[in-house]
């Protein structure tokens, strides 16, 4: 993984962490692009059960910086409330009611999607908060496209 490439990497945490803490836990030289906040798995610490994780993408500005996570969160919860998948889902409805009015900084984050140069992910190796990681798309770094992080 630590060759001259860029990658997207999904990280699952050992427990939920507030967004404000997640921001401090992650290296500054990777891009935080998606927050995993809910799944139908009762005890996430036991590992994936094949259920889909629910979360939302973070909007980025022209400098690849997160610029309006509150709006992103609000749109996510509005979409969940309208989803037929959540209409009869008691646990899902409970999650919505407990979290939709929280500020992003206080949301329980179970995992994240990150992008960046593969060498920058090395800082996450052996971190106790990382329960698991999954490498998604990778691409070689080429001279005519410079990664921002």
Roles of regions detected by a PLM:
Residues 18-20, 117:
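General structural signal for secondary-structure boundaries
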Residues 22-30, 123-130:
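Short amphipathic alpha-helices in soluble, non-transmembrane regions
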Residues 89-149:
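Extracytoplasmic/luminal low-complexity segments enriched in Pro/Gly and acidic/polar residues
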């Amino acid at each position: 993984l630590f060759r001259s490439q860029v990658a997207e990497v999904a990280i699952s945490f050992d427990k939920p962490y507030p967004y404000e803490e997640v921001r401090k836990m992650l290296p500054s030289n990777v891009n935080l692009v998606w927050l995993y906040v809910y799944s139908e798995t009762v005890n996430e610490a036991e590992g994936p059960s094949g259920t889909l994780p629910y979360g939302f993408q973070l909007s980025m500005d022209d400098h690849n910086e997160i610029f309006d996570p509150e709006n992103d969160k609000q749109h996510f919860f509005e979409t969940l409330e309208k989803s037929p998948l959540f209409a009869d889902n008691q646990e899902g409805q409970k999650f919505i009611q407990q979290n939709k009015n929280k500020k992003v900084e206080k949301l329980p984050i179970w995992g994240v999607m990150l992008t960046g140069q593969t060498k920058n992910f090395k800082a996450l190796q052996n971190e106790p908060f990382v329960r698991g990681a999954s490498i998604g798309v990778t691409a070689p770094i080429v001279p005519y496209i410079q990664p921002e992080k």
